[in-house]
Amino acid sequence: METVFEEMDEESTGGVSSSKEEIVLGQRLHLSFPFSIIFSTVLYCGEVAFGLYMFEIYRKANDTFWMSFTISFIIVGAILDQIILMFFNKDLRRNKAALLFWHILLLGPIVRCLHTIRNYHKWLKNLKQEKEETQVSITKRNTMLEREIAFSIRDNFMQQKAFKYMSVIQAFLGSVPQLILQMYISLTIREWPLNRALLMTFSLLSVTYGAIRCNILAIQISNDDTTIKLPPIEFFCVVMWRFLEVISRVVTLAFFIASLKLKSLPVLLIIYFVSLLAPWLEFWKSGAHLPGNKENNSNMVGTVLMLFLITLLYAAINFSCWSAVKLQLSDDKIIDGRQRWGHRILHYSFQFLENVIMILVFRFFGGKTLLNCCDSLIAVQLIISYLLATGFMLLFYQYLYPWQSGKVLPGRTENQPEAPYYYVNIEKTEKNKNKQLRNYCHSCNRVGYFSIRKSMTCS
């Protein structure tokens, strides 16, 4: 989990704004330009914009069925994105009416992206101004400058983490059903207009990006939250693996649904509920107990609800591709950080069998009606694409995995980018010496970006 920070106000710091402050810096944190946040925002905007445009086209054509599902997947994905961003930034605990207003309008990712870019340029400006300051004496101006730098760093890393989780949830709870639906519509009416193709392209990019994020998260967990840096060859291998896996699985599902129509629904529900119930069956078999106070029923209900939501997302990921992690509800960490070849091989074996069965159903029941020709060739290409994806997966874990090839950056963690500590020492006057300085780095993580200590003058 990430460390979440709160800004310091006068009440929490005991009126420290009117006191003499001294800031002692540790190692300087380095921030990079938020390209990942911009990319996630572009995917969000593109998918929502083209989805709304297709909704308008279906509405004018009186296609109520397709119109309803298209707008439903857009709204569900967009609302979940707003909830994730507000959850990580703890907006509901603060008086942030303006940000809440933008989230209600489903424009939260755009506003936060622009805010992060502004903070990054503000951080660069403050660093440049800090270097120009004389080091003869530390004034209150220097104190406020260092605090602005600290807040910029805190906000940048918090937004990066929030957008990472937003990308995963948007991909597998919004983009996957949207991509399957639009492909099903194209197969049914045998038309591929440019607008629908662009919507499918953004959805495919979103799912692939979310799958890559799952891989990076799994590698960080297996290496104790250590930051990784994949060279171009390793990154290309992961991209090809995830792209081929996602495209072959999604096209297979679309062909299967188009072949059997509503008769395919029970099969798809069985596949989904197997992934959903498997962690709970393993938890029940282990005989473990849920964490928390058994006497507090509300706490127990909240824990069960949170675990159920996690398993819903876990099953949605495994429905379209491999989640790269294994849920272990009996453990306090929930996610098993060990690399299990057995779990990996079992997943790909069963999913390959599912794909072959669905492709055979398409070949013998829907190939002639959905496609005028080349149904056998397409079926073979789908199987070969999935086998190629499995081959890239084996290549990555056997020869290019960062833990084995020494590409883990020592001394750096996801929660601790480059500097181990960032100390803020505050000397307060005798008027405020009985008021305690609140640590604005919450302990929701093992290691914080900041460590605050207080020095008080003795009368």
Curated annotation (Swiss-Prot):
Domain of life: Eukaryota
Entry's transmembrane regions: 35-55, 68-88, 97-117, 169-189, 199-219, 238-258, 264-284, 300-320, 345-365, 377-397
Compartments, as annotated in UniProt: Cell membrane
Tissue: Expressed predominantly, if not exclusively, in testis.
Keyword check for Lyase: no
Keyword set, alphabetical order: Cell membrane, Membrane, Transmembrane, Transmembrane helix
Primary location recorded for the protein, binned into one broad class: membrane
Membrane topology classification: Multi-pass membrane protein
Any single Gene Ontology cellular-component annotation: plasma membrane
Classification via PANTHER family: MEMBRANE TRANSPORT PROTEIN XK FAMILY MEMBER, XK-RELATED PROTEIN 3
Family indicated by similarity: Belongs to the XK family.
Protein name as catalogued: XK-related protein 3
Protein source organism: Homo sapiens (Human)
The organism's taxonomic lineage, starting at the top: Eukaryota, Metazoa, Chordata, Craniata, Vertebrata
